[in-house]
Structure formats: C-alpha cells, structure tokens
Amino acid sequence: MDRYAVIGQPVAHSKSPYIHNEYARQTAQAMRYEAIEVGVDALVPTLKRLHDEGYLGVNITLPHKVAVAALCETISERAALAGAVNTLIRTDTGWRGDNTDGEGLVRDITQNLHLTIAGKRVLVLGAGGAARGLLKPLLDEKPASLTLTNRNPWKPEELAAQFKAHGAIQPCTHLAIKGDQFDLIIHATSAGHSGSMPRIADHILAPGAICYDLSYGKAFEIFAAWARAQGATRIADGLGMLVEQAAAAFRIWRGVEPDTAAVIAALHKTVSNVEAAETSVHDSNAKKRTAAEHTAAAHSIAAED
C-alpha cells in the first residue's frame, strides 16, 4: 500500500488525514495517509527517513513550510514565488517541492462559490506567508485590480515588486483603504486566532461582494462578524481552500480527481458539531461557576449575619 503523510508541529489537529483518506476511498486508491509530529530539530532526518521508507508524498504544515523549501532538490515556480512548500513529491534521489495553497483558494472561489475572479477588484488583507502563496494564482486569474494591505507598508511594497512580472499589485496599509470598493476581500492575517481584526475602513464592499477568510472555526468568526456588519451576504471560511489544496496535491500524487464538495460538506458539519459541543461545555461550566458563586455569596452573607 502506498504511503503518504503530513508533518508539522503541532499536527494532531490536522484534518489532512481525514481528507486524503476520504479521497482514497472515493477513488479506490490503495494508499494510506497519516499525521506525523515533527519538531524543527527532527525535520531533516525525518524527511530522509520518509524517503528511505518509500513514502511517495508528504504534505508540510506549520512551522516547516519555509524550511522545507530549502531542502528540496527542485521546487515549482509557484513554490519558489511563495517562498514556501506545502507538498512534496518523491523523486529517485529526494523530494520535489510544490505549493498548492493558491490553487486551492482559486478553485474554492471559482468552482464552489461560483465567483469569476477575472475582471474583479480583489483585496488581500495581510502580506505574510499565507498571502504570499496566493498572489500568483490570483494574478493568473486576471483580476481588474489586486490590492495588498498590511499594517506596515514595506511588506506589500516588497511583494508588489517581487510579483511585478506576473501582474500589478497595489500595495498600501490597512488604514489607507478609503473610498475604494472590492468584489472579493480575502482575509489572510492570523488576527482571528487572537480574537482581533485588522483595522480597515468601512464601506469597502461592492454589491454582491464575497468576504473570504483563510481561517475556519472560531478564528473565522471575528472576520465574519465584521463582514456581516458591513452588509455582506456572501461570507466564506477557509475549509473549502483546505479541501481544495489537498485535492491539488492528491491530483499530483495519484492523477485522479476527488469529489471535494462531499468532503467540504462533511467537514463543515464536523466543525459545526465541535463548536456546538464546545459551546455546550462552556455554557455548562459557566452555569457551574455561577452556581458556585451564588453558593459562596450565600455562605458569605450567612457568615456576616
């Protein structure tokens, strides 16, 4: 049976094993996909071990995407531009690196959300590693404009210069977006994981605009709340991108097309159930705390009496 894996730290939470094993079931592929916890110090020997043991492909997640790019025999143009690798393909003597993140985003937007990016005004919030992997695939779709924002101006300016041969990028800070409207807003910062949101101007959504967050679950809710407050009716999380970037890797490895829609639906249901369970637990704990506080208060009053 052919073997594949995702490596990172932490990696126990990864949905990649479910996604790829489901793809294998759908397409009758004789393969097994697993998650392997790998720290920074173990990265090089682990990649050698996986190659020696005959693994045919490996997905890379945090914190190794940048480091792995330098360890590959060759890398694709899009991986080189992204400065990061999320997919390894076995060669006779090592690994070839690729990056399917941007392809996953574009396929989710165009095929699952049915938005044509060509001719649209696109805004990408954030100019870090996550955004960098999206820029060439977005530019390849020929948007009317692509604006890249960040807290500090130098990062968008640097990326605009780097990607100049592939298309025009308008760099600016978050606060400099005023008076413009966009058809597609992509949130590519990690702010949602800390319960915050980049400071950007109001009234920047064009009619029918899609607001898209690379995050999902609780980290998605901050951006979603902002989008709803701006009147957005089309808001999407990053689960579709996660599933589609995995499908892109699966096609490279196996040469077959999986059914991504079924997996996206299943994952959305799973995430919703987990969040509902967590909310129930939190509510239960809150009630217990409230009851304990009331009991303590009653004891305090009784003692004072």
What are these regions (language model features)?
Residues 8, 99-102, 109, 113, ...:
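Glycine-rich adenosine-cofactor-binding loop
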Residues 143-163:
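NAD(P)-binding Rossmann-fold cofactor-contacting core
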Residues 140-145, 230-233:
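Conserved S-adenosyl-L-methionine
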Residues 1, 118-121, 207-208:
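Phosphate-coordination loops involved in phosphoryl transfer and adenosine-cofactor binding
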Residues 1-113, 218:
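Phosphate/diphosphate ligand-binding glycine-rich loop within oxidoreductases
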Residues 166-235:
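Rossmann-like adenosine-cofactor binding region
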Residues 119, 214-281, 285, 302-305:
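Adenosine-phosphate binding glycine-rich loop
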